[in-house]
Amino acid sequence: MNGDDAFARRPRAGAQIPEKIQKSFDDIAKYFSKKEWEKMKSLEKISYVYMKRKYEAMTKLGFKATLPPFMHNTGATDLQGNDFDNDRNQGNQVERPQMTFCRLQRIFPKIMPKKPAEEGNDSKGVPEASGSQNDGKHLCPPGKPSTSEKINKTSGPKRGKHAWTHRLRERKQLVIYEEISDPEEDDE
């Protein structure tokens, strides 16, 4: 038996259960009747403890996690004290802290944009082709730049559809690529 699974080991008769384990078991025991709790093996109890911990972690991160099935049994309340079965009772509810944009940006820095897009500048500057109407061609009036010129000139969230183009850099020197042949093809 590994030393890491101390949580999973059964205490000997007369031995005391550590406070941390006892507290987590007590948190889970309130969802079961005394008979059910006594019939459960310690491994089952531990799995319920882990289920609850995962649920707590997901809700703390701001995700809408489904309530574990064993927590439905007694008209359970969620971690913030909100009563699932009785939404009429607004006085007893604790306001849940909302996930702010800055927190999300710290958690998912590459996914979230650095600045929220301005409402007036979404993608109005770049027209899109719609089916066979324009056949993929855009007609620009003579003094206005084409869409490809607009993409090169604009920066930030104003780009709309081509938001990734700012990551590409222009090469200062012309690069010539050679085709490398496979040694297997040379044999034939």
UniProtKB/Swiss-Prot annotation:
Q: Does the keyword Cytoplasm apply?
A: no
Which tissues carry this protein? Testis-specific. Expressed in a melanoma cell line.
Q: By its UniProt entry, which InterPro entries does this protein fall under?
A: aKRAB, KRAB, KRAB_dom_sf, SSXRD_motif
What keywords tag this UniProt record? Answer: Phosphoprotein, Transcription, Transcription regulation
Which intervals carry biased composition (Basic residues)? Answer: 156-170
Q: Which cysteines are joined by disulfide bonds?
A: none
Functional summary from the UniProt entry: Could act as a modulator of transcription.
Name listed for the protein in its UniProt record: Protein SSX7
Q: Please name the source species.
A: Homo sapiens (Human)
